[in-house]
Amino acid sequence: DCLLSRGLGDVYKRQGYVYVAQIAMGADYNQCVKAIAEAEAYPGPSLVIAYAPCINHGIKVGMSKAQTEEKLAVEAGYWHTFRYNPALKAEGKAAFSLDSKAPTGDYKAFLNGEVRYNALARFNPERAEELFAKSEETAKERYEYLNKLITLYGGEN
């Protein structure tokens, strides 16, 4: 159920007065800079949540490719980028912008590119396949949910 998978950003978006952005610098540098600038300029509390791979993710191609990993996460639909600016709603403008596009990457290939997931696939392939499929379905539901927010908050994709 996608209701159970809503994240930290959703909690604060519902407050109605908190600027919230989800970013991945390697996926879209301009969106990242824009979100940080908007958060800084916003006259109330701001929350910027970034996808930032670390050594414990076990990126198979190495940490020097962290920016590429961020891009792959967004392309696969593992991570979505958006901005919610309540000040825009007060101005009669769209408050929500879903900045990432519909996923086009291979979700399971993305998961298998990180040791933290790949280890499960090696240890228990059947269970990994089940969990990876469930995770992919949840990610699709999450994107659909974010698309619905465009209508709810008045926004763009």
Regions found by a protein language model. Name each.
Residues K13-Y17:
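Gly-rich Lys/Arg/Thr-decorated short loops/hinges at beta-loop-alpha junctions or inter-strand turns
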Residues E136-N157:
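Short, amphipathic C-terminal "tail helix"
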